[in-house]
Amino acid sequence: MKKILLTLLMCLSFSLVAAELQIGTNFDKTVQVMPTDNKEKIEVIELFWYGCIHCYQMDPILNDWVKKLPKDVYFKRVPAIPRGEWAPMAKAFYAMETLGVSEKLHTAIFDAVHKDKTLSPADEKAILQWVTLKSGLDRKKVEDAFNSFSINATMNKAVQTFRASGASGVPTLVIDGKYITSSTMAGGNNEALKLADDIITNIRKDKK
């Protein structure tokens, strides 16, 4: 009797997860299966743009979620570059990483664009000047980072990542290179993160 009850409970639990995950509705498969950095863990990518108000609104919620991720899950951001005018902020993101000031300036650059409205996300010269001022670094060092070959190569990879994901906007979450969800698809920021949790749970089961 106990075995039957346990089986029923397991089936019910699976049904609840399956009911929440509706492929083609609140999540979908990526256009291409994308390689991940660590096959031993589950990868979560946020595709985002500093000029996106929805990304700005999601950022603090996402940061709290990332802090609670289990050890078998790792997170990284990839700037979306679906068109040329998004490139300056992508370059800023990678330059700040190279310069070691991402943690210091990530929220600040969002605030400059959306809260203070003192920075245009498409003005590369103004963005470079802002990073120089806020980082306290030598301007030549910042310029070299912005214009480095390695950053251009990384940006090309980011373009490929966005295309392979099949994302139609940002912010979008790519889970383990196979699935995507977003606030739009899921019906809200918290809902998107809950769906990501459910997808991660199912992927973890498949890996066993």
Ranges and model annotations:
Residues 55, 85-86, 120, 155, ...:
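Alpha-helix N-cap/helix-start motif
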Residues 14, 112-115, 148-152:
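A short structural micro-motif
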Residues 39-41, 89, 169-170:
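A structure-centric signal for secondary-structure junctions around beta-strands
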Residues 50, 57-129, 199-203:
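Structural alpha/beta surface segment adjacent to cysteine/selenocysteine redox centers
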Residues 20-29, 119-125, 195:
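Periplasmic c-type cytochrome electron-transfer domains
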Residues 4-5, 133-208:
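C-terminal cap of thioredoxin/glutaredoxin-like
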Residues 3-84, 159, 163-164, 201-208:
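Extracytoplasmic thiol/disulfide redox context detector
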